[in-house]
Amino acid sequence: MKISLKNLGYEYPTFENNKNGIYDVSLEIDSHKRIAIVGHTGSGKSTLLKLIKGLLKKQTGEININGKIEDIGYIFQYPEHQIFETTIFKDISYGLKRLKLNEKEVLERVEKILELVGLDKDCLHHSTLNLSGGEKRRVALAGVLIMQPQLLLLDEATVGLDLNGKEQLFKILLDWQKEENKSFLFITHDMNDVSEYAEEVIVMDKGKLLYHTNPSELFEKYSDELESLGLELPECISFFNKLNQKLKNPIKISGDIKEESILKVIEEKIK
């Protein structure tokens, strides 16, 4: 699924003046990508996702989607709020009602998606009320992924998760993307997520698009600008930049900027 935004604009009513809208945003989102969206609170990140999904109606500009709006899945900031007080099976399979599948087909889909999100199929008839916060997020994610979206939008879905919980969530997303050849956009305030999981990154400020590039170029060219926006660089990138300031021949990194890759480059340089 490809999405094209041209001069997109949206402004909130005056009584919601604590929210920043979107102003003249143009960008292309290609298929089969992992894209991070970053920016300080109120920069327009969530508004952008809601406009793409159709939860907000654009006021100016164009949104062109190569597909159906129903093929876009959406995970809110606190995914556990997306589930019902019912059994896990009923919650996950709720959206399948409109597809008119038979019981066997529904069960097959539910069991497959449970395996993907790491939940035991023996828990199908357990109540969602008795689940932990992490389990509720998995159920919410399963309920969206079972509809087989072409594109998944995640509005700070990792908020409140510890490092282990975050890694588990991204593993699910990466496995889903690889198996289904799909795309996902995720909002994050943690720049480590950008270096570890994103193929592209969108930087927003005050409702405007500042950069749309790959993580390697972003950290190489715009580190100072990111810090001026209050975005804390990943520790490995910060260390790398400080090291480069002391070297006569600065090290350049292109492509993979995951922490282990950067440390390997530094280690080879020091030898």
Curated annotation (Swiss-Prot):
GO terms, molecular function: ATP binding; ATP hydrolysis activity; ATPase-coupled transmembrane transporter activity
Gene label: ecfA2
Positions of transmembrane segments: none
Biological function: ATP-binding (A) component of a common energy-coupling factor (ECF) ABC-transporter complex. Unlike classic ABC transporters this ECF transporter provides the energy necessary to transport a number of different substrates.
PANTHER family: ENERGY-COUPLING FACTOR TRANSPORTER ATP-BINDING PROTEIN ECFA2, HEAVY METAL TRANSPORTER
Subunit structure of this chain's protein: Forms a stable energy-coupling factor (ECF) transporter complex composed of 2 membrane-embedded substrate-binding proteins (S component), 2 ATP-binding proteins (A component) and 2 transmembrane proteins (T component).
Record EC number: 7.-.-.-
Main location: membrane
Topology class, membrane: Peripheral membrane protein
Keywords: ATP-binding, Cell inner membrane, Cell membrane, Membrane, Nucleotide-binding, Translocase, Transport
SMART domains reported for this sequence: AAA
Designated name of the protein: Energy-coupling factor transporter ATP-binding protein EcfA2
Origin: domain of life: Bacteria
PROSITE patterns: ABC_TRANSPORTER_1, ABC_TRANSPORTER_2, CBIO
SUPFAM superfamilies noted in UniProt: P-loop containing nucleoside triphosphate hydrolases
InterPro entries per the UniProt record, alphabetical: AAA+_ATPase, ABC_transporter-like_ATP-bd, ABC_transporter-like_CS, ABC_transpr_CbiO/EcfA_su, ECF_ABC_transporter_ATP-bd, P-loop_NTPase
Gene3D superfamilies: P-loop containing nucleotide triphosphate hydrolases
Residues reported to bind ATP: G39, H40, T41, G42, S43, G44, K45, S46
Family assignment from sequence similarity: Belongs to the ABC transporter superfamily. Energy-coupling factor EcfA family.
Residue stretches making up the ABC transporter domain: 3-231
